[in-house]
């Protein structure tokens, strides 16, 4: 299985001609953690994924993986680094003329010299991981959209990637199947300890799936950090998007103009209370992810730097044993049950 790697993005900017997509994007994805990238339509989230894997070249900035800057490295080194990535595209991106087995096996046949017997063992393992055992001979046109996404996910995992990218995995799925897919993503992170980055519009996914959340808005990264930071934030953009409200700076186009905001204020738009934070999805088997302990140490190390509401949310998630370990007091109800970190 792959083991996650830290991904450090520094000052990344991308344009198409004179049209700027985003500027000076800087954040770090800790190894093995689940990260979600949100933002209104048209903010360049999918473009960011393509820059991350080297399909598009940014005008400025750096992307560091294993001390290699993907923006400036030589083509042969970039080719090797790309093998560290697995990608689930919006529609699964399966070859319609191939059955699911051959779709999943494709990267192994293209990028390795493994024997067919080895390939079969690996493919069957990955298909079992995503719940597709018995469907190997089916064609993409014979299965549901959710199954196609799972087949695409199996293909993305087949080279044991250190970094797994998900481009709107919930696109086209109903809420129930989105919930099943989110549980699968958590379970796969537990099994692989790979670093996950998920681009999505789904608010429930953003509230329950990630360890860290980032929001792109108005050609910049508005905020990136632990889930507790964003889910308790009163920043107008972050709060509006994560709670799916009409009231706020985000309009039908990316940003409301001054007249719209003034009219909203004159109409007495009230300040909304943040809803209670939803619990993070836990592995189905009741165990923990390897990233949980690392994340807990990391977040507790920065606790004093976070706003009070985020601090309180983190403290409230700790068990009694964890409180004693970190010397924490002043939290809410103490728990010895499932952990969020």
Spans of model-derived segments:
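Conserved ABC ATPase signature
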Residues: 139-143, 147
């Amino acid at each position: 299985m792959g083991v996650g790697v830290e991904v450090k993005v520094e000052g990344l900017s991308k344009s198409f001609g004179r049209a700027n997509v985003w500027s000076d994007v800087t954040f770090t994805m800790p190894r093995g953690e689940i990260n979600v990238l949100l933002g209104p339509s048209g903010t360049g989230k999918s473009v960011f994924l393509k820059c991350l894997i080297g399909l598009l070249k940014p005008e400025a900035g750096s992307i560091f993986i294993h001390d290699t800057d993907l923006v400036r490295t030589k083509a042969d080194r970039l080719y090797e680094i790309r093998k560290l990535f697995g990608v689930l595209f919006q529609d699964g991106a399966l070859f319609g003329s191939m059955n699911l087995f051959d779709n999943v096996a494709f990267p192994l046949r293209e990028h390795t010299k493994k024997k067919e017997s080895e390939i079969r063992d690996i493919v069957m393992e990955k298909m079992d991981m995503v719940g597709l055992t018995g469907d190997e001979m089916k064609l993409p046109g014979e299965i549901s959209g959710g199954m196609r996404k799972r087949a695409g996910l199996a293909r993305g995992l087949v080279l044991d990637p250190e970094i797994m990218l998900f481009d709107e995995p919930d696109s086209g799925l109903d809420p129930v199947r989105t919930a099943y897919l989110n549980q699968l993503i958590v379970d796969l992170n537990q099994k692989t300890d790979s670093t996950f980055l998920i681009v999505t519009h789904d608010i429930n996914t953003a509230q329950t799936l990630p360890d860290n959340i980032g929001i792109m808005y108005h050609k910049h990264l508005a905020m990136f950090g632990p889930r507790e930071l964003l889910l308790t934030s009163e920043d107008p953009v972050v709060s509006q998007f994560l709670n799916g409200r009409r009231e706020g700076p985000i309009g039908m186009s990316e940003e409301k103009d001054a007249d719209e905001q003034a009219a909203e204020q004159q109409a007495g738009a009230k300040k909304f209370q943040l809803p209670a934070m939803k619990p993070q999805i836990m592995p189905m088997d009741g165990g923990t992810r390897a990233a949980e302990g690392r994340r807990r140490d990391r977040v507790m190390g920065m606790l004093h730097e976070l706003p009070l509401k985020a601090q309180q949310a983190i403290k409230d998630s700790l068990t009694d044993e964890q409180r004693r370990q970190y010397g924490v007091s002043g939290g809410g109800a103490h728990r010895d049950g499932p952990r969020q970190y």
